[in-house]
Regions:
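Helix-start (N-cap) detector for alpha-helical repeat units in TPR-like alpha-solenoids
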Residues: 7-8, 42-43, 76-77, 110-111, ...
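Structural signature of tandem alpha-helical TPR/SEL1-like repeats
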Residues: 20-33, 55-67, 88-101, 123-135, ...
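Terminal, low-structured helical/coil segments at or just beyond the last alpha-helical repeat
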Residues: 2-8, 14, 156-192
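Canonical tetratricopeptide repeat
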Residues: 13, 47, 81, 115, ...
Length: 192
């Protein structure tokens, strides 16, 4: 029979109650107390990381995610969230590592492919970025974001014919994105 830790349960339910009531500062305080008692608790680390990010303290959130991903059972989404925040903080090489780690754990995590593509663009590693963004479009073919970034990369690489193909494709399901790309690139593309 599994033993229930009532102290841990009390911390957890207090934090949940405060979150539901909109008292996020109290929830943070409760979760910090929980970490004092249970320093490696995944629930407390993940919840604090999320609440710190919501409160605008991205570095504190990164610190919590780093502790969370250091656990042997770290999940792909924890690595993805860490990468996302690192990219926001312009920690590009660290973000790339985190996205790659997320993809090692779950190669179908489309958001991580997109994040990886963005970090590679920022490092001007365009060939790798194209591969990552294409993988995202395979997993999420109707999401315009990776298509948009692909077109931008092709324009940066002086490949307008590839950008035209993407704009034409976007006109079929996301005409606003297609129009934005036409304005930004100066290309006028007829729908096929």
């Amino acid at each position: 029979m599994m033993k229930i830790d009532l102290k841990w349960q009390l911390h957890k339910w207090r934090a949940i109650t405060f979150i539901v009531l909109g008292r996020k500062a109290w929830a943070i305080e409760t979760l910090e107390d929980m970490l004092a008692d249970y320093p490696n608790d995944a629930y407390a680390l993940g919840s604090l990381a999320h609440l710190y990010a919501e409160a605008g303290d991205k570095q504190a959130s990164v610190d919590m995610y780093k502790k969370l991903v250091a656990k042997p059972d770290a999940q792909a989404f924890a690595w993805y969230n860490l990468g996302y925040l690192q990219e926001e903080l312009k920690q590009i090489a660290d973000a790339e590592f985190s996205f790659r780690r997320a993809l090692e754990l779950n190669e179908k995590l489309d958001q991580a492919w997109y994040g990886l593509g963005l970090t590679l663009i920022q490092q001007q590693r365009f060939e790798e970025a194209i591969k990552a963004l294409k993988r995202n479009t395979q997993l999420q073919p109707m999401s315009p974001y990776a298509w948009y970034q692909l077109a931008r990369v092709h324009m940066d690489r002086q490949q307008p014919e590839e950008a035209v193909k993407i704009i034409r494709h976007l006109k079929g399901f996301e005409p606003k994105f297609a129009a934005q790309l036409e304005r930004e690139t100066g290309l006028e593309v007829k729908a096929s």
